[in-house]
Amino acid sequence: MKVSDIRSKFLQFFESKGHTVVRSSSLVPANDPTLLFTNSGMVQFKDVFLGTDKRPYVRATSSQRSVRAGGKHNDLENVGYTARHHTFFEMLGNFSFGDYFKREAIQYAWELLTKVYQLPADKLWVTVYAEDDEAYDIWAKEVGVPADRIVRIGDNKGARYASDNFWQMADTGPCGPCSEIFYDHGPDVWGGPPGSPEEDGDRYIEIWNLVFMQFNRDEQGTMTPLPKPCVDTGMGLERIAAVLQHVHSNYEIDLFQALIKGAGRETHIADLNQNSLKVIADHIRACSFLIVDGVIPGNEGRGYVLRRIVRRAIRHGYKLGQKTPFFHKLVGDLVAQMGEAYPELAEAQSRVVEVLKAEEERFFETIENGMSILDAAVADLKAKGGKVLDGELAFKLHDTFGFPLDLTQDVAREQEITVDEAAFDAAMTRQREQARAAGKFKMAAGLEYSGEKTVFHGYDALSMDGVRVTALYVDGASVDTMQPGQSGVVVLDNTPFYAESGGQVGDQGTLVSGPAVFAVADTTKIQSDVFGHQGTLANGALKVGDTVAAQVDAVRRARTVRNHSATHLMHKALREVLGTHVQQKGSLVDPDKTRFDFSHNAPLTDAQIRQIEEIVNAEILSNAPTVAQVMPFDDAVKSGAMALFGEKYADDVRVLSIGTSKELCGGTHVTRTGDIGLFKIVVEAGVAAGIRRVEAITGDNALHYLQSLDARLNEAAAALRAQPSELVPRIGQVQDQVRALEKELEKLKSKLASSQGDELAAQAVDVKGLKVLAAQLDGADVKTLRETMDKLKDKLQSAAIVLAAVADGKVSLIAGVTADATSKVKAGELVNFVAQQVGGKGGGRPDMAQAGGTDPANLPKALAGVTEWVSAKV
């Protein structure tokens, strides 16, 4: 039974039992800052269990995408080395919100496992909480599980209700006993039943956990029965698939085998049992779905976890000899396996490929140098008998070459050494403190100030003369005089500079007083009505009480206001096209773009994006005036002005009317909509469950973007000798031609392999009754080498053969040994004998092995030594 069938049968079964099939929520938990990633099926129903949310159904079932990497739940270091650890997995679950309870939950589970999945009942064991007689009796008396296969588990974690079979969401709140179902793999696998000293073995594998939320636990630890008990169950799809497909490792199921084959294809590795291929296959799932849900590689939070996973996959590819980006090429394989179940993956395929490729290209620029340093350090350490790698070196690899600590630890573990984490942490802390000291002038919000307020004039002016310096700060401390070259913060009594707020970035510009010139890099608020002008004093001295001429960077401001005004028009258009459920969830307006996050539960279609662009550009063409009014908050709301949910507003607010848009806004804007010039959406993506993101550009940025697209379109048309209007059908013709040529090429390669096989067979040397052949095939690829190898083995009947090819400075090697000779000559050893001489390594089965190398100059010598090497073996 394929993974896709197992998933669909689960959902269909519970749907037939009155459950609503609920789509998987985002891997980025909505409104839960305590959780890095969604790591179980119940996460999207947490508020329902807590009683703070209600759904239109009381029974639900789902297949939830989940990630365990980073934070409390982190399986990253074990992935690829064990049978069942993954960064990404799917959790099948059924849920009852005050509807059915233990009896139905247990009966449903048993029916699905034994009737739908047809697992042998005598292979299933169950556990119950020691005091849960109700669950025990249901299993024993109603389901009919023999008593010797029902295990009571008590408080085995050192405290009351601290048990593998008692679940609690937190120290207080909903909790209750649980019942776990185990599958017995049989006596050929070591391990004991749950609750026994040997329970950590692999014979008895947990496949399903049924949680019965029965009590509410208060701060004193008192358990009070819930008026409406709930059920939360979870079954790992990969685990149950391994059971149903009669394999012991999750990596042997059909879904993973397809991804592992893809990883082998892209890394040119024939031995699909290598742990590195398992790592790559696992990581493409986690990385792709994180990107689908709006996470992008970065240096903090979720983005850094994603970067760590991507770079771990790249390192394992590098370990296999892959020196160019390959990881992003597996997205297509993943879509083929999971795109039907998760259409959002297929829809985001090109974006996922783009993000992964960019991250790969970035890391491949440094990985070779970093690995050279790391390999040398490890070799030196082992030569000296050491066991702990210097943490300072690990930090250098992190800081200079982009090696996450766990990547270095991964390499160290393979060499049976560890990394000094304490020294790494100390180096990291030291760097952060230095950065914090260097950047103190940026921390305007933390400065102490008790002087007069700043009066903002930037709605009407970009420059002002005679404004007074009321305070100066250097390194976070108040000073009377700022010296040339110092960075700090200047506070003025009046200013045309807009201070960052409401998503709009702060202004840049200059403050000039005689010879003193202060370059303003940013403007932020020290207090709600006190502006801090952050920057560096280029020359001269500046004192408190000096008067300065303040000049805002007019070009930068103009680009920013175009983007801000366009944001308002876009918000209105989004509500018009998608519905009034659209609410702003965040924004960033800078000179380059506007980024707008909003509530919506589906990706925008191309047609919707075009419609939004048309609405906004029509507003721009109308050249309507922008009108700003200050009025009481209640009056503003009554007038129809949109306010942001959860935002705190003063008694009097500024209402901005631009075109048909009307919002509360304190930002700066164009005078008329025509000043925006042009509007173009360039990015649409998901960032969290029910949250979408749009990025757009305006004015000259939009014009340059479209000109660039036009230029590339013309280049493509010229390359295909077609007019731009004929490009699509011309591409179709070229694709047809390519496919036809590829078929013809395959035929020619097959003929070549056959003819070369005949010619090469005559070159074989007899060594003690075994035919030995080592040859280089010019122009051959790996497939041709394999086909030629098969023909030679058939023709020679008893032989040891090495075939090689060189392309783009890289060596491809295939070794083959006929079955009668594998007891004396192993193909894996033979191919490694040659590979080591050409800067590579490889492996495979005793009868067939593959390798690669990077030094083709040594290939003739290496091939010449094959006969002598085989002679020594036989």
From Swiss-Prot:
Subcellular localization(s) per the UniProt record: Cytoplasm
Gene Ontology cellular-component annotations: cytosol
Keyword Chaperone: no
Family: Belongs to the class-II aminoacyl-tRNA synthetase family.
Catalysed transformations (reactions): tRNA(Ala) + L-alanine + ATP = L-alanyl-tRNA(Ala) + AMP + diphosphate
Taxonomic path: Bacteria, Pseudomonadati, Pseudomonadota, Betaproteobacteria, Burkholderiales
Record-level Gene Ontology MF annotations: alanine-tRNA ligase activity; aminoacyl-tRNA deacylase activity; ATP binding; tRNA binding; zinc ion binding
Record PROSITE patterns: AA_TRNA_LIGASE_II_ALA
Cofactor note: Binds 1 zinc ion per subunit.
Designated name of the protein: Alanine--tRNA ligase
Regions that span the bilayer: none
Keywords for the protein's UniProt record, in alphabetical order: Aminoacyl-tRNA synthetase, ATP-binding, Cytoplasm, Ligase, Metal-binding, Nucleotide-binding, Protein biosynthesis, RNA-binding, tRNA-binding, Zinc
Stretch forming the signal peptide: none
Coiled-coil regions listed: none
Domain notes from UniProt: Consists of three domains; the N-terminal catalytic domain, the editing domain and the C-terminal C-Ala domain. The editing domain removes incorrectly charged amino acids, while the C-Ala domain, along with tRNA(Ala), serves as a bridge to cooperatively bring together the editing and aminoacylation centers thus stimulating deacylation of misacylated tRNAs.
Names of the cofactor(s): Zn(2+)
PANTHER family: ALANINE--TRNA LIGASE, CYTOPLASMIC (PTHR11777:SF9), ALANYL-TRNA SYNTHETASE (PTHR11777)
One of the protein's GO biological processes: alanyl-tRNA aminoacylation
Function: Catalyzes the attachment of alanine to tRNA(Ala) in a two-step reaction: alanine is first activated by ATP to form Ala-AMP and then transferred to the acceptor end of tRNA(Ala). Also edits incorrectly charged Ser-tRNA(Ala) and Gly-tRNA(Ala) via its editing domain.
Top-level taxon of the source organism: Bacteria
Record's keyword annotation contains Nucleotide-binding: yes
Residues reported to bind Zn(2+): 564, 568, 665, 669
EC number: 6.1.1.7
